[in-house]
Amino acid sequence: MSWAGSKRRQELPEDWELNYRLPVLSAAGWLCEVDGPGCVRAATDVDHKKPGNDHSRSNLQAICRVCHGKKSAAEGVARRRELKARRKRPEQRHPGRR
């Protein structure tokens, strides 16, 4: 994930590295738990399975940089689609149609 211009890191707990990131990576044997296409297997990142600030162990997974980039990109595309759909007016039925 690119941290450039992101405020995401500021939202993480101060003890993120020691009490969240390292235990998650260690428990996974430093291997990617996503194992998607192009996976490099060596986990270097910890990802939130569901976006947000839920830092519970059940919502965290070890992930390689390739899988993390693809997952983050897909989440970004989905979010932009959602926001675009909200901007459209709801389709109105023609008053003469039942």
From Swiss-Prot:
Region (Disordered): 75-98
Ranges of biased composition (kind: Basic residues): 81-98
GO molecular function: endonuclease activity; nucleic acid binding; zinc ion binding
CDD domains: HNHc
A Pfam family: HNH
Name of the protein in question: Gene 4 protein
Domain HNH: 41-73
Organism: Mycobacterium phage D29
UniProt cross-references to InterPro entries, sorted A to Z: HNH, HNH_nuc
